[in-house]
């Protein structure tokens, strides 16, 4: 896994800038994005920009057909999932759509 680039960080912070009170922190092989101290999205070098899903919002993300981050543990072979779904391509090109999804995510966190 490669590190995320300065360009990827700038892209993500610009994409969600309309939320205001946005902070970031490097972790989990990427960059976590926070609004008013609550993590709502992350940027992963391998998977791109992902939105956090909790509660009923998880079902909405699945219904949208978005890719859900899962992984297999090498040692045990068991699969696990993280509470993150890849943003749709349309949201990557539309900050309003991205921020709408972020607000929906935050409402369930």
Task: Describe each region flagged by the PLM.
Residues 1-109:
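Charge-dense, helix-prone N-terminal extensions
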């Amino acid at each position: 896994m490669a590190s995320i680039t300065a360009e990827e960080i700038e892209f993500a912070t610009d994409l969600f800038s309309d939320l205001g009170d946005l902070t970031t922190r490097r972790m989990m092989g990427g960059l976590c994005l926070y609004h008013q101290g609550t993590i709502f999205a992350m940027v992963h070098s391998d998977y791109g920009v992902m939105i956090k899903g909790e509660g009923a919002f998880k079902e909405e993300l699945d219904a949208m057909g978005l890719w859900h981050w899962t992984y297999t543990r090498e040692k045990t072979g068991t699969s696990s999932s993280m509470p993150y779904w890849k943003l749709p391509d349309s949201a990557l090109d539309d900050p309003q759509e991205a921020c709408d999804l972020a607000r929906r995510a935050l409402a369930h966190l």
